[in-house]
A protein has these predicted regions:
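Conserved catalytic core of the tyrosine transesterase superfamily
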Residues: 1-310
Length: 310
């Protein structure tokens, strides 16, 4: 189709003065063709287009299945055209100025299948250092079995104290963590994680430097960093033969997904993840810890393993 004179002159401006690449110019030309078709179908001249026209046309593009990102590019091209017309005094109002593309849907969090998560947790590398294997096994169990954020995991201290941001109480099978916004919460710890914790605590002293409070320490004996956890978990997933890139937050997603699938209790899962309004003086808003423990024990696949014997 033959483009309107204004559109042709604007394309020339983009080519000569803005020096846009040929491929970019071709994309702009397609966007302008659609703008002209919309205007002709509405019986309105390009210089007389109003914001309600643009909103309707953007809606039609969305209805036809054009991705929000592509619609945003389309609107950007149209917006630039009307800005250019405005500089020459041909239009008073830029009809695209206040129009935004539909928001792109947030991607669903990726979670492992139950059998993949269990395989990852149960992975044992005989070639690895027994100390590192015990540590990594414990970290994996807590990330998946408790749904901890990596920051919460690494803030755990080996012993409870007034200075500790987080700790695990093996006696009442709970992890006490400081989450986002300095909000404390308690999360039940299942039998598999307690067994892994006991095994790690037996050898932790061989790595930790004197006086180091951190539950999880590096080869240097100091508190682990998030990047070190990501690296070790990635390696563990590769050795387990998992076909996907695994990171700590994926285990948190897996925790939530598997628990919700089994229990259907959205409110309990929300509390366990720390997504509710939890303050430092009130751990839970509406659900008591006993109810959360019951939901966890009945639904989470790693909670059903027996804890270590004294």
């Amino acid at each position: 189709m033959l483009l309107d004179g204004d559109l042709l002159r604007h394309l020339k401006h983009l080519e000569v003065e803005r020096r846009l690449a040929a491929r970019t110019l071709a994309n702009y030309q397609e966007a302008f063709k659609r703008l002209q078709v919309f205007a002709e179908s509405a019986g309105v001249a390009l210089r007389e287009v109003q914001p309600h026209h643009i909103r309707r046309w953007a809606g039609q593009l969305h209805f036809k299945g054009l991705a929000p990102g592509s619609i945003a590019i389309e609107l950007s091209a149209w917006r630039g055209f009307y800005r250019w017309l405005g500089r020459d005094g041909h239009v008073v109002l830029n009809p695209v100025a206040g129009v935004r593309a539909p928001k792109a849907p947030k991607p669903l969090p990726k979670a492992l299948a139950v059998d993949q998560a269990v395989l990852l947790a149960d992975q044992f590398d005989h070639a690895d250092s027994p100390l590192l294997e015990a540590r990594d096994h414990c970290m994996t169990e807590l990330l998946y079995g408790c749904g901890l954020r990596v920051s919460e995991l690494l803030s755990l201290d080996a012993q409870a104290s007034t200075q500790a941001a987080g700790w695990i109480d093996a006696q009442d099978a709970s992890a006490h963590v400081l989450g986002k916004g300095s909000k404390r919460r308690s999360v039940p710890v299942g039998g598999a994680a307690l067994r892994a914790l006991a095994a790690w605590m037996e050898v932790r002293g061989e790595l930790a430097t004197t006086g180091e409070a951190a539950l999880f320490v590096s080869n240097r004996g100091t508190r682990l960093t998030p990047s070190q956890v990501r690296s070790r978990l990635k390696l563990r997933a590769i050795k387990a033969g998992l076909p996907t890139h695994v990171h700590p937050h994926m285990l948190r997603h897996s925790f939530a997904s598997h628990l919700l699938q089994s229990s259907g209790d959205l409110r309990a899962v929300q509390e366990l993840l720390g997504h509710a309004s939890i303050t430092t003086t009130q751990v839970y808003t509406k659900l008591d810890f006993g109810h959360l423990s019951k939901v966890y024990d009945a639904a989470h696949p790693r909670a059903k393993l027996k804890p270590p014997l004294e």
